[in-house]
Amino acid sequence: MTVSSGDPDVHASRSAQLFERADLVIPGGVNSPVRAFHSVGGTPRFIREASGYTLTDVDGNDYVDLICSWGPMILGHAHPAVVEAVQTAATTGLSFGAPTEGEIELAEEIVRRVAPVEKVRLVNSGTEATMSAVRLARGFTGRTKVLKFSGCYHGHVDALLADAGSGLATFGLPTSPGVTGAQAEDTIVVPYNDLDAVAAAFAANEGQIACVITEAAAGNMGAVAPQPGFNEGLRTLTRDNGALLIMDEVMTGFRVSSAGWYGLDGVAGDLYTFGKVMSGGLPAAAFGGRADVMAHLAPAGPVYQAGTLSGNPVAVAAGLASLRAADQGVYDALERNSATLRTLLSDALTAASVPHRVQTAGTMLSVFFSEDPVTNYEEAKAAQTWRFPAFFHGLLSRGVYPPPSAFEAWFVSAAMDDTAFSIIADALPSAAKAAAAAVQP
């Protein structure tokens, strides 16, 4: 059954029951906050299965998926090559706690694709990757302070939750309770796309900043690309001040090109973090970079990092299969599909006289209800975000599943076809009208 009603929850009775049940044993009923529909209201959809571009919930509703598991599913769901790789790996053992050849192959694939990355360490999540990269940067430089950007999200690492995007943006929190003052004191936060602020921070903290960490292109305040020269400027400022540049490509890595954002702008970081696409949809991530920096990582060096399930053979098999299947044809399809979605969104919102900007960062995109370009977090928050819940439910109730937050990027998959875009095109006029009719609280 495909959703066709304008009522956001009319066909969600089983999801509602499961959400109530989940809330009894899981905080907030979900295992990652944005899934709770906190900023859009209504009942979170509990998913039964997925194939290609289609999600099917427990009530039997089908949706064109524009979340793609928050980025990993560039091939679409249940891609045969990935499923076969997982099944084959699982028959030989689920976890060994010892090295495997697959770990080497996955690391080699990452090194082959991203030239500045000379060595790689596999971990289980993007949060682990960024946490470990920052620790390594501190150990390598002997410095303590970290510079990050307002609205950029680097996982739920204590030191990096200050003024973050993603889930914290959804909840309107500048940071999280439980993050100590001492941790916050070592984190310097400046506006995204503002090189003058970065230069001023270095001047005010001379010899103290271990690293600058940035999303290679921001996706957790919505899709906000670096302005021309911004990443290049970060490279110059970090090099001139003896700090490392950490490029967080958990979101952009292997999605916006076969070499991630590095493949688009060619700016070489000292360290990189990866996740999502390289995981094939299973829990896996990585960090890597210059060989001389990575040489400080245990057991080769003194900076400790470890993980029981790091390099898990089933996750490694999924990631390797996903990367190997992502040939140029896949990236061409992602470009086409992103461009088509962008046009459909803008045409529908223009027809409904809704102020908007459909912004892209590579093949990621976001809808901002603003007439002005969004280049940083403050501008993202200044948009008419109160229009988003009506727009979201206008799409969801008609078989299209966008991210349930105005501050998250939208993702396409290579599996999307004319039928998928026909469903989107049919859903958009009423959703755009709902956004136009929304009333500011």
UniProtKB/Swiss-Prot annotation:
Catalytic activity from the UniProt record: (S)-4-amino-5-oxopentanoate = 5-aminolevulinate
Subcellular compartments: Cytoplasm
E.C. number: 5.4.3.8
Pathway recorded for this protein: Porphyrin-containing compound metabolism; protoporphyrin-IX biosynthesis; 5-aminolevulinate from L-glutamyl-tRNA(Glu): step 2/2
Enzyme class: isomerase
Cofactors that this protein relies on: pyridoxal 5'-phosphate
Coiled-coil blocks: none
Transmembrane segments: none
GO cellular-component term (any): cytoplasm
Lineage: superkingdom: Bacteria
GO biological process annotation, one example: protoporphyrinogen IX biosynthetic process
Subunit composition and interactions: Homodimer.
Family: Belongs to the class-III pyridoxal-phosphate-dependent aminotransferase family. HemL subfamily.
Protein name: Glutamate-1-semialdehyde 2,1-aminomutase
Organism: Rhodococcus opacus (strain B4)
Gene assigned in the entry: hemL
